[in-house]
Amino acid sequence: MSFRFGQHLIKPSVVFLKTELSFALVNRKPVVPGHVLVCPLRPVERFRDLHPDEVADLFQVTQRVGTVVEKHFQGTSITFSMQDGPEAGQTVKHVHVHVLPRKAGDFPRNDNIYDELQKHDREEEDSPAFWRSEKEMAAEAEALRVYFQA
């Protein structure tokens, strides 16, 4: 079973958490180590179009995932980011939250991370030549999946 993420089909091997309404996956081109995404299962383009139960689940999952990636990647803080609409920088037409574990000094200026996120999915940089291997992504997902097993 594949997961739909906007125009992309996501293989289960890169998904490390699934709930009734949301899923979390590793990023093919992370801005920092541990940069992952949390998405609603239903392919909804804009945040305003999510149902209340989807909003609740999305943010509960985001909170859980943030705690795990901060610990796993030895972060000391987390940046959560959502671009909602094209003028906000959204390139995949599916609501998603970027979860990025942070460390002191990971960027010269703390807010540089937003510049990197802005460049993250630009067409000229979003090609397979810039992506991690499926094997590397699956290994990371497997390592994160362990934290969510009951």
Curated annotation (Swiss-Prot):
- Tell me a GO cellular component: cytosol
Give the EC number.
Answer: 3.6.1.29, 3.9.1.-, 3.6.2.1, 2.7.7.51
The protein's location, in the record's own words, is: Cytoplasm; Nucleus; Mitochondrion
- In the record, what terms sit under GO molecular function? adenosine 5'-monophosphoramidase activity; adenylylsulfatase activity; adenylylsulfate-ammonia adenylyltransferase activity; bis(5'-adenosyl)-triphosphatase activity; nucleotide binding
Reactions catalysed, semicolon-separated, are: P(1),P(3)-bis(5'-adenosyl) triphosphate + H2O = AMP + ADP + 2 H(+); adenosine 5'-phosphosulfate + H2O = sulfate + AMP + 2 H(+); adenosine 5'-phosphosulfate + NH4(+) = adenosine 5'-phosphoramidate + sulfate + 2 H(+); adenosine 5'-phosphoramidate + H2O = AMP + NH4(+)
Annotated HIT domain ranges read 2-109
Q: Which Pfam families match?
A: HIT
Name which cysteines form disulfide bonds. Answer: none
Phosphotyrosine modifications at:
114, 147
Q: Can you cite a GO biological process for this protein? A: negative regulation of proteasomal ubiquitin-dependent protein catabolic process
What phenotype is described for loss of this gene?
No visible phenotype at birth, but about 30% of the mice lacking one or both copies of Fhit died for unknown reasons at an age of about 19 months. This might be due to increased susceptibility to infections. Mice lacking one or both copies of Fhit show increased susceptibility to carcinogens.
Instruction: Give binding positions for substrate.
Output: 8, 27, 83, 89-92, 98
Assembly behavior:
Homodimer. Interacts with UBE2I. Interacts with MDM2. Interacts with CTNNB1. Identified in a complex with CTNNB1 and LEF1.
Q: What does this protein do?
A: Possesses dinucleoside triphosphate hydrolase activity. Cleaves P(1)-P(3)-bis(5'-adenosyl) triphosphate (Ap3A) to yield AMP and ADP. Can also hydrolyze P(1)-P(4)-bis(5'-adenosyl) tetraphosphate (Ap4A), but has extremely low activity with ATP. Exhibits adenylylsulfatase activity, hydrolyzing adenosine 5'-phosphosulfate to yield AMP and sulfate. Exhibits adenosine 5'-monophosphoramidase activity, hydrolyzing purine nucleotide phosphoramidates with a single phosphate group such as adenosine 5'monophosphoramidate (AMP-NH2) to yield AMP and NH2.
Provide the protein name: Bis(5'-adenosyl)-triphosphatase
Question: Which gene is the coding source of this polypeptide chain?
Answer: Fhit
